[in-house]
């Protein structure tokens, strides 16, 4: 279970953009064809909250010119599209949270006020002059309130994942905060995620129950799995196959298998198409690692040149754009840069 529900998509992006190697990208290659299943004005809207939101929006719009640049961490990328329903209102969809999580990726580059202004601009770029624009701004303020409330929890909500009691408390706390701050947006934002976490918790309780025999545990786990909706059960089966394949890839690499030998073995297990995708991803990953190493060496030279922080960051951003020209590459490089910086 994620320590912060609001951070989950950011963790997913870090796994995609970071240098996690073949095992992780193999999962992307194998299941890239599988569709994702995602779920005006939230229930219990308070006039005071709407008024505060309106003031904040007006201030942000007045303070930031339309020509303000994209944060370095998002250079070369674009925000997800905000969905609308048939009436032109903001659709209650998980995609709205994905949009805000995309914007939140820039938190390391921006102050809180600048981040608000950036979100205002991104919303206006898609919804300017529509009723959905005000709705999106309201949901953004609610989501920020949710994240702020999570941050007040002990250890920012971090919990021992092996302790069912602590996990249960954490789930209940997050669900309560989500409903209090997001109203009926809590279901599209976190409903599927919370269901999955409660399912995982139920599995953990069964596996840790010392009063059960192995046969009884297996029986209860099978019964629990049957409670899953059909699409969730299919998704879980895909995850299980993915994990098994990733374990197999790791073992093949550990044993020193050649690329051809790995492909032959994976073809037997996954089929020729998936094996070919894994092989291509391996080549792409090797190319990426080489280019990032060259870029990192040039970045280090810039960092050692004694430039002002503004000039240094500008030169590094320009270098990143020159080296990484494919969609998403510059964002991935920026994510790795931040990870390297936090490690020192």
UniProtKB/Swiss-Prot annotation:
Gene designation per UniProt: lifO
Record-level GO cellular component terms: plasma membrane
Alphabetical list of InterPro entries matching this protein: Lipase_chaperone
Entry's transmembrane regions: 14-34
Function: May be involved in the folding of the extracellular lipase during its passage through the periplasm.
Keyword Cell inner membrane in record: yes
Compartment(s) where it occurs, according to its Swiss-Prot or TrEMBL record: Cell inner membrane
Annotated SUPFAM superfamilies: Lipase chaperone-like
Keyword Membrane: yes
Any GO BP: lipid catabolic process
Pfam family, one: Lipase_chap
Membrane topology annotation: Single-pass membrane protein
Principal location listed in the UniProt entry: membrane
Stretches assigned to coiled coil: none
Protein name as annotated: Lipase chaperone
Family affiliation: Belongs to the lipase chaperone family.
Any one GO MF annotation of this record: unfolded protein binding
